[in-house]
Amino acid sequence: MSMAEGDTLISVDYEIFGKVQGVFFRKYTQAEGKKLGLVGWVQNTDQGTVQGQLQGPASKVRHMQEWLETKGSPKSHIDRASFHNEKVIVKLDYTDFQIVK
């Protein structure tokens, strides 16, 4: 039995540009990721952006990508979201969704 595309495990890196630091963006990203059952990480960069990696079923990752592009935390202002290094994976590299300091 083959898995549907929506159930295929994928990994994707992301970087979010805009007013995304000092507005609890990482905390909300972690909470949304966990709610969707995704694993990965999120951290602030020295350039004022937020970056990280998402892993999980493709359908859930797509949902999270849309959330990162359009929603974020209540006080954030997202200019744009960049997604790269997307690939199909056999197993998850993480066990949780973490905030990296």
Swiss-Prot record:
The keyword Lyase does not apply. InterPro entries: Acylphosphatase (IPR020456), Acylphosphatase-like_dom (IPR001792), Acylphosphatase-like_dom_sf (IPR036046), Acylphosphatase_CS (IPR017968). Organ-common type isozyme is found in many different tissues. Signal peptide: none annotated. The active site is at R26, N44. One of its GO terms (molecular function) is acylphosphatase activity. Residues 11-101 form the Acylphosphatase-like domain. The keyword Hydrolase applies. Gene3D superfamilies: 3.30.70.100. Keywords: Acetylation, Hydrolase. Belongs to the acylphosphatase family. This is Acylphosphatase-1. The gene is ACYP1.
